Regions:
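Conserved donor NDP-sugar-binding/catalytic core segment of glycosyltransferases
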Residues: 78-124
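C-terminal, non-catalytic tails of nucleotide-sugar-dependent glycosyltransferases
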Residues: 99, 109-110, 121-148, 194, ...
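Acidic donor-binding segment of Leloir-type glycosyltransferases
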Residues: 9-48
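Conserved short acidic donor-positioning loop in nucleotide-sugar-dependent glycosyltransferases
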Residues: 24-26, 53, 77
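Short, well-formed alpha-helical segments that are part of the catalytic scaffolds
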Residues: 1-11
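Short aromatic/hydrophobic "clamp" motif used to bind/position activated sugar donors
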Residues: 71
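Glycine-rich, basic loop-to-helix element that forms the pyrophosphate-binding segment
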Residues: 49-66
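A short, conserved alpha-helix in the catalytic core of glycosyltransferases
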Residues: 85-89, 143-168, 172-203
Length: 259
């Protein structure tokens, strides 16, 4: 969290923001010492969500407290790379036809973690170009191009507050997986565009903050969320992502041809 906040405070060219931190069952003493330190700042609030982990509910809880016209959902395991990132996202999000803007996210080893989401990857949905070099242009330069997509990850997602309220936030039935994709699809269904902007760039040290899907309970919950996604968006899964060529494979994220 400190690395995330420091990167924004030190680098961001856009300055008119507040931090809303949602604390959910941390146990480390240094975490609470850090909260005490940053709560002295005028633009920081720490909220305490004491129930079991539910990514959708936690984000809804925090967003309800936000004062701004735009809300940036941002995981604590991120770090700003490009100083203009927030400005870049805001420039696109201010368009009246846009509801959501996502960013280019980079793994610690300088490969791509997220350059948009494609519906159908791996049977449900997955990140485009994951694992490719951060400087690759990608298929038809899609890694480096601002473009409309079906979905982006909520690890770094800007949404207009009025649109967030219109679709009633994230669906809390999706506790961990697919909540961001469901949210983007709801926003598209309401008539707004979802846009990927690669000029906004963050590192994403993924799953460091929450662990992996490794227990029987977690696997069962994941399967349940796959089923729920299929119930809600089965027609889209059947017909395919409108932003993805049906001649390309769904088995890999590199936009290669079907075999």
């Amino acid at each position: 969290l400190k690395k995330c906040m420091d990167s924004i405070e030190e680098k961001s060219t856009y300055r008119n923001f507040e931090f809303i931190i949602v604390e959910n069952n941390s146990t480390e003493e240094e975490t609470f010492a850090y909260y005490k330190e940053i709560e002295k700042r005028d633009n920081v609030r720490v909220l305490y969500y004491k129930e079991d982990f539910n990514y959708s509910r936690i984000n809804n809880f925090g967003a309800k407290e936000a004062n701004g016209e735009y809300v940036l959902l941002l995981n604590n395991d991120t770090e700003m790379i490009e100083p203009d990132s927030i400005k870049e996202m805001l420039d696109v999000c201010m368009r009246p036809d846009v509801g959501i803007v996502g960013a280019k996210l980079i793994f610690e080893d300088n490969t791509i973690q997220h350059a948009g989401v494609i519906i159908g990857f791996g049977g449900v949905a997955g990140h485009a170009f994951i694992g490719q070099d951060r400087d690759d242009n990608g298929y038809f330069s899609r890694i480096i191009s601002v473009q409309d997509l079906s979905a982006v990850t909520a690890a770094c997602l800007m949404v207009r507050r009025s649109v967030f309220d219109e679709v009633e936030g994230l669906n809390e039935e999706f506790k961990v997986a697919f909540n961001d994709i469901d949210f983007c699809l709801k926003v598209r269904k309401a008539g707004y565009l979802v846009v990927y902007n690669p000029y906004a760039q963050f590192y994403h040290y993924e799953s460091k903050s929450r662990g992996q899907e490794d227990s029987a309970d977690k696997v069962a919950r994941f399967q349940q969320e796959i089923g729920l996604f299929g119930e809600r968006w089965g027609e889209l899964l059947e017909h395919g992502d409108p932003y993805y060529n049906p001649n390309l494979t769904l088995d890999k994220a590199d936009f290669s041809l079907k075999e």
